[in-house]
Amino acid sequence: WNKGYKNLIPVNQYNVDYSILGGSRIEPLLRDIRLGMSAAGMTVESVKGECNFGQHEIAFKYSDALSNCDNHVIYKNGAKEIASQQGYALTFMAKPNEKEGNSSHIHLSFRGLKGELVMTDEADKEHGMSEIGRQFIAGQIAHLRELSLLFAPNINSYKRYVPGSFAPTAIRWGRDNRTCALRLVGHGAGLRLENRVPGGDVNPYLAVAGIIAAGLDGVKKKLKLEPAFTGNAYESDSSRVPASMSEALELWENSAWIKETFGAQVQAHYANMARVEIAAYGKAVTDWELFRNFERF
């Protein structure tokens, strides 16, 4: 805060994606975060370095949707507190600099009322996926653009969507295809859908609510799923993730499905939230403007 978040020194000065040494250098902090989350009842599956300098990823064992959202909030606050105690500043903002952004990929599968597998079907030799699973994904594709405000709730969120940056720009689904917004991974009981659109700044409750609502609409309407995309989705002519909060606001505010699904009050509330954010950003004088214009004019 006192430095205005400028000239901060990252804990790693290079790309430490899957680097054992890179993780070891910050292990005292990572260990305390793992132990703290375990003490809070979470099961930490892995921690690893990532591409941006000082960027690290943590993964937790799956649970029911509401419990995972609760754990998400506890983790983010707890990790910040633990980092502060060790003299570090930690951020989950979607795009803290021009390198790779911070994501919050949501992995989701679902069961029947008696706990039975309903997303999988071993008779499907292509993907091992049931017709209900296909309809659920089709619902995601149908409604992803109008739900973007729930996945990307800040001005900064949209700066993460850059081609080739591990953040999606194309609304397609693919089998283990990281260039798509939706990625199908696993098999059998572990078959699941990854939504790669949410960033680290996401409100998990809103994002998960949107994912479930879109999927159920796909099942209700028996939507047909397009074939899996197999190429580089960044280079495709696919429908795109909104490039700005203004675009996402327009899609959200004008959606009859959003109004029907969440209610007019919820639709109006989050539309107002976006307008407030956009207005505040419009009044700010940024470093980019100073650098570009101070000597120029």
Q: Can you say where each PLM-predicted feature lies in the sequence?
A:
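Glycine-rich, acidic/polar active-site loops that bind/position phosphate-bearing ligands
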Residues: 1-297
